[in-house]
């Protein structure tokens, strides 16, 4: 296989940490496998000195199969035969399996029983253990505190089941962090209920600025079209002052002056219908009026809820404790335990040194799906320049396990003697229209004024070959539908909505086929 210059650089580069941002269709897997092969065949790094981690067993199995195929193509020397023998037990696995291997080797240092280290909890066992833990935690919690928490949730139409769901969501976040980081995260959340969070105030200011900017742009269109524009120019002046406000307090003061000293936007000006402008202008204005808040009142309000947050975290910690006890009774561990126990063991100097000496090279696939704890696990025993990471933030799919694509983004911005970011931006798989659509689509859904730019220039995919441009360029259609959340059975409403949506897609496919587009050339992503 011939590799492009960027692909070959990713294969050949040595003596540095590498993070590769690889778009879909860029040959990422081929590059990763070829690099692995070259490490074994050219650098003569034994396969048992390489750690390769991915996020699915299938991907790990494919990596092993491709490497075995490459080894079979080589002259069957003693070294090659040795590598083929080592491949079966090589550390090419999911990160969970790697963590489990550490736990099983050093279980007695945690300490847990040998039986517990060998038994992974089934989903049914995990659910039973959690339900029992939750029941025990409620019983151990102060009754008055829990009653107040229930009443607060009930005031928003939430039930005790919703409290349990919140606890599970919090635990998912805590499980993605080390014990120390989890404690800091909880303390920061609790502290945020004692003061006005500067980040929150910045978000609020951005939100209001965006609406003011939209109002100002409408006036820019309208003012040149009307003869007597003085009142609207006054509105524009006040909006300019709002936009120049650098703090929330200043913005609030300026906007209140705007409301007090300007007239409303009329539907008819100079006998001309301006209702479409007026409607849009009013929507933005109303969004500000309805969401503007008094800082002192808001601070008192959040402070009055701090005891509820404290209760929520106290309940979470109790559930976490009882959950561990329930699993210990069953003598099982779950996936979260594997990572936490592995990280705990890697803080032991002897184990850390052993792992450091064992692995000369570390490869991490699907790096965009790494969470904070997994990154800390790798950092616990890696060398200063022996980790090769590859991923694509657009393909991050493990949000439910608290995957954090920002970890990869931060590595991509880190360039020094020990860190080299590389780009594989050429998509060799899709035709040009699909690539262009994806770039446009992701730039819109991943970037917004409040959360900042998540999709950057380095994430843009390019067409790999001229042949992809010469292919028939069928349009890509994005269908967005939403259903009204009216009174009634929500499951039935959603089912009917989905059926209508699928009927619409099916009808559209049939019509396109009648126009001569073959079925194999159409794709509907749902």
Predicted regions and their residues:
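P-loop NTPase Walker
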Residues: 1-111, 326-336, 350-353, 395
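Conserved helicase NTPase motor core
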Residues: 3-4, 11-12, 17-21, 51-52, ...
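Conserved nucleotide-binding/hydrolysis micro-motifs of P-loop NTPases
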Residues: 26, 57-60, 69, 96-99, ...
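Alpha-helical scaffold elements adjacent to nucleotide-binding pockets in ATP/GTP-utilizing enzyme cores
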Residues: 31, 35, 62-70, 98-105, ...
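Short, polar/flexible loop-turn hinges at active-site or ligand-entry regions and domain interfaces
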Residues: 44-48, 72-89, 106-124, 134-149, ...
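Conserved RecA-like ASCE P-loop NTPase motor core of nucleic-acid helicases/translocases
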Residues: 46-60, 67, 90-92, 365, ...
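Conserved ATP-driven helicase/translocase motor core recognized via long
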Residues: 49, 164-332, 503, 510
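Helicase-core coupling region on the C-terminal RecA-like lobe
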Residues: 165-168, 423-514, 522
């Amino acid at each position: 296989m011939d590799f492009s210059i960027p692909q070959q650089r990713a294969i050949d580069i040595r003596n540095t940490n590498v993070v590769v941002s690889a778009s879909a269709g860029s040959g990422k897997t081929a590059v990763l496998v070829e690099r692995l092969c070259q490490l074994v065949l050219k650098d003569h790094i034994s396969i048992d000195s390489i750690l390769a981690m991915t996020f699915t067993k299938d991907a790990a199995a494919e990596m092993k199969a491709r490497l075995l195929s490459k080894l079979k193509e080589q002259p069957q020397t003693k070294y090659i035969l040795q590598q083929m023998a080592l491949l079966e037990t090589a550390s090419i696995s999911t990160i969970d399996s790697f963590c489990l291997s550490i736990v099983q080797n050093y279980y007695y240092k945690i300490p847990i029983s040998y039986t517990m280290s060998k038994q992974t909890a089934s989903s049914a066992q995990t659910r039973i253990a959690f339900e029992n833990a939750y029941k025990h935690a409620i019983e151990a919690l102060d009754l008055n505190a829990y009653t107040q928490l229930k009443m607060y949730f009930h005031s928003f139409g939430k039930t005790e089941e919703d409290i349990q769901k919140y606890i599970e969501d919090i635990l998912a976040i805590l499980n993605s962090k080390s014990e120390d980081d989890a404690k800091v995260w909880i303390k920061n959340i609790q502290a945020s209920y004692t003061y006005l969070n500067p980040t929150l105030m910045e978000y609020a200011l951005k939100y209001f600025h965006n609406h003011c900017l939209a109002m100002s742009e409408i006036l820019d269109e309208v003012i040149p079209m009307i003869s007597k524009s003085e009142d609207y120019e006054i509105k524009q002046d006040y909006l300019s002052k709002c936009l120049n406000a650098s703090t929330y307090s200043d913005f609030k003061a300026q906007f209140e002056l705007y409301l007090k000293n300007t007239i409303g936007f009329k539907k008819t000006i100079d006998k001309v219908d301006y209702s479409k402008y007026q409607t849009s202008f009013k929507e933005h204005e109303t969004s500000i009026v309805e969401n503007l808040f008094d800082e002192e009142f808001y601070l008192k309000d959040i402070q009055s809820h701090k005891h509820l947050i404290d209760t929520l975290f106290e309940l979470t910690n109790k559930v976490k404790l009882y959950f561990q006890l329930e699993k210990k009774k069953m003598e099982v561990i779950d996936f979260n335990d594997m990572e936490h126990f592995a990280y705990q063991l890697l803080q032991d100097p002897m184990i850390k040194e052993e792992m450091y000496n064992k692995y000369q090279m570390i490869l991490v696939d699907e790096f965009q799906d790494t969470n904070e704890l997994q990154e800390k696990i790798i950092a616990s025993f890696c060398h200063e320049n022996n980790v090769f990471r590859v991923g694509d933030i657009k393909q991050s799919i493990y949000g439910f396990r608290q995957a954090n694509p920002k970890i990869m983004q931060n590595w991509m911005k880190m360039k020094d003697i020990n860190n080299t970011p590389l780009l594989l931006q050429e998509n060799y798989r899709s035709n040009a229209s699909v690539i262009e659509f994806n770039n446009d689509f992701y730039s819109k859904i991943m970037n917004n004024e409040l959360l900042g730019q998540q999709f950057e220039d380095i994430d843009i995919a390019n067409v790999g070959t001229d042949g992809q441009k010469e292919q028939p360029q069928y349009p890509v259609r994005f269908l967005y539908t939403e259903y009204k959340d009216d009174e009634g059975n929500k499951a039935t409403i959603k089912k009917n909505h989905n059926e209508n949506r699928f009927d619409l897609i099916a009808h559209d496919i049939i019509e396109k086929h009648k126009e001569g587009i073959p079925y194999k050339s159409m794709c509907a992503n749902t």
